[in-house]
Amino acid sequence: METYSHAFFTWALAKHGVKAGRAAGIAGAAGATVPDLPSFAGTAYYVGTAYLWEGWSSMHSEELLDEIYFHGPFGATGSALHSAMPVVALLLVYWVFGLGRRDRRRILLWFLLGWFGHTIADFLTHVDDTRPLLWPIWDWEWSSPVSYYNRLYYGREFFIVSHGLMLLIISWLLLKRIVGQKRRRTLLPDRSVKRPPA
């Protein structure tokens, strides 16, 4: 999935789904971006500002894409962050040491859940750009039958469904806010009407 999709769905789930709060929603969205940070840094390092003007066409070779996403310092770090092992280890530390007692607003928990959710979603939506899910313990990779971008593997359909769902959630949240504001106005006394003196 696109990085912004990971962040949006985690934010929506944390803040509006399970009602963990605003801070948890922001932390979840931040955690959901963590696995892709090395690819952003690699793109900035290898391609620079050309990416801003030319987009994907600025990445003119497979070797360049491999350096950004799979090899070298950026690719290796990205593979480590896309593995479930580091985040599962941190979730175990959170649970074993009872960090939930100190994390009352669940900020750290949602950060880790956002990261974990990104890892699982990418595992399920990557076909030809897979990473080992259990690295460094096991180098096994799975090629999903569905791609988040490749049209040969339902990428267009996935894009329509995921972005349609984001649009639906945004519309629902806006409608909920508008209805809530109207209700508050009807429940509050109108202060503009002057009452006659008693």
Q: At which residue positions do the language-model features occur?
A:
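N-terminal membrane-targeting hydrophobic helices
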Residues: 1-198
